[in-house]
Curated annotation (Swiss-Prot):
Motif mapping: Nuclear localization signal 2 (NLS2): 184-247
Organism: Influenza A virus (strain A/Chicken/Hong Kong/YU22/2002 H5N1 genotype Z)
Gene Ontology terms, MF aspect: endonuclease activity; metal ion binding; RNA binding
Name of this chain's protein: Polymerase acidic protein
Lineage of producing organism: Viruses, Riboviria, Orthornavirae, Negarnaviricota, Polyploviricotina
Similarity comment text for this entry: Belongs to the influenza viruses PA family.
EC number(s) reported in the record: 3.1.-.-
One biological process term in Gene Ontology: cap snatching
UniProtKB keywords: Cap snatching, Endonuclease, Eukaryotic host gene expression shutoff by virus, Eukaryotic host transcription shutoff by virus, Host cytoplasm, Host gene expression shutoff by virus, Host nucleus, Host-virus interaction, Hydrolase, Inhibition of host RNA polymerase II by virus, Manganese, Metal-binding, Nuclease, Phosphoprotein
Record note on cofactor: Binds 2 manganese ions per subunit.
Amino acid sequence: MEDFVRQCFNPMIVELAEKAMKEYGEDPKIETNKFAAICTHLEVCFMYSDFHFIDERSESIIVESGDPNALLKHRFEIIEGRDRTMAWTVVNSICNTTGVEKPKFIPDLYDYKENRFIEIGVTRREVHTYYLEKANKIKSEKTHIHIFSFTGEEMATKADYTLDEESRARIKTRLFTIRQEMASRGLWDSFRQSERGEETIEEKFEITGTMRRLADQSLPPNFSSLENFRAYVDGFEPNGCIEGKLSQMSKEVNARIEPFLKTTPRPLRLPDGPPCSQRSKFLLMDALKLSIEDPSHEGEGIPLYDAIKCMKTFFGWKEPNIVKPHEKGINPNYLLAWKQVLAELQDIENEEKIPKTKNMKKTGQLKWALGENMAPEKVDFEDCKDVSDLRQYDSDEPESRSLASWIQSEFNKACELTDSSWIELDEIGEDVAPIEHIASMRRNYFTAEVSHCRATEYIMKGVYINTALLNASCAAMDDFQLIPMISKCRTKEGRRKTNLYGFIIKGRSHLRNDTDVVNFVSMEFSLTDPRLEPHKWEKYCVLEIGDMLLRTAVGQVSRPMFLYVRTNGTSKIKMKWGMEMRRCLLQSLQQIESMIEAESSVKEKDMTKEFFENKSETWPIGESPKGVEEGSIGKVCRTLLAKSVFNSLYASPQLEGFSAESRKLLLIAQALRDNLEPGTFDLGGLYEAIEECLINDPWVLLNASWFNSFLAHALK
């Protein structure tokens, strides 16, 4: 069919049809019947207008080949075939110069002799059916409708056919020829059956009974009835000037609508100040694991037993010393806390039977690190409501921080593949319905792309730590319990592996409300030297605790092993969300699924297999200062997952605000990209709302810098 269209129609018509389809996101190579229909419709519109002129005396005449110098004006203005913006411009200018009522839909032609817009229809069905659909859709007495069919029938408003017999016969003959040409190539049947009805047929919908009473009760002020309100809404010209409309609606509103052009948006202003620091609850790219493969020791699966077994795999322990102190803390206490952990683990081993949990002795260093007895005493409100100068503490404004490069590196690392698999393919029952089959297939493909991703490791690590901490907080409220930070995975060969990242010591945890805080001290292994990016580790005290032998291409090298220690805190509600981090997998799967659905609806078949198996195709991943970054479908899956995981790891009020407010600016910029001529008012206020969220959070600052890259490239 596509070849036929390109042979049968004038190249200019073919090009216009391709442009029109692209504007609506349709592909002429796939929707070939639609392609043919658009070309046919364009050709009929051009033939309708051909040879018809208006002379100096404003009489309508037909000139097939005459004096090219005669002062003739085309009788018909052709609107069909122009892009939407241009088409509306032409329609508006005709309405302004002639005073004709503005149509609700873009018509095909304007007749300067009869002073009316014309809607041309070409149908493969009954002309009457099609005429009614058109009339129903445009609902305007003023627009003249003229329908042609491929069988030589026609129908027009009030049987007024506008053109002379001969001109109409030319059109009918051409349509009949197209039909015969299609039939001879075996294309006609498919073409005839593919015609759908007009897309926007609105029915008169009556509301009665309770719904009607509710509708009348919920009208805006100053409207007596639903009809009265409907009439007002229908008469509300969307393309009129909005300022006037706003003042019609309310006396208090005065907004100047400014057009949003490519030059309008400025980049977001990122804060100055010292570089931002790491604030996640556990180390990400800098974490180091002590691991055991194929664990089969006694008590395997009991965290404390697993932790001791992992600790025993390492032989390079040495006398710890502080290499990067915490600016504000009492650093010797952090050092003593680590020594206490080592000593108490040693004590456990000397016991006959290893206990399932370990509560640490309440030493001075731990009391200090866990803020024991530091919280002001809570007093019942009844006892102090008469105090005259009762007031809340003054709190300092947060200090601004600038974007540091480490957070982009963290994100890049989260998108990478590790050499272990972090999630198992869940056993789900047999598929029953076809839709379940597609769903399973998508889930399996997606799982294959993300199961080895570092972001998936972070999910499992987060789920484990939060579950263990919430359990201990409820089960051992008064104890300083030692909680190993553990994860489990499978190696490439399918062997099970248990990993120890370090330890947490929990403080007192009488958590009555969701937001009550439990303090904890985290101690995590790492090979990263904190002196390389000291700003990243502002909240940590870092010790050097051993030397690790690493296998490299040149043989074994010894690297210092560090312990990152800090005081931290969390709450029941944060732990609850942390335990549910697996949701990130679902969220990113749904985003991928909507991409597959978009592909499938264009091709009119399920594209899951092609989508994941066509390795040559690249997809947009995100914006960077270099432009739009592209990558394989696997990379897209992992990037979406990493974004979702970081939204969870770095959740904060700043992120909530930035996401909600920047989305508005994003939508405006996308509308401009799609040539929808957006208008805005109080753009300055929107910028203010976005920028008040850019304070010191590393993930928010990184998102803001990505947003600036998007603005720069999207509006070039």
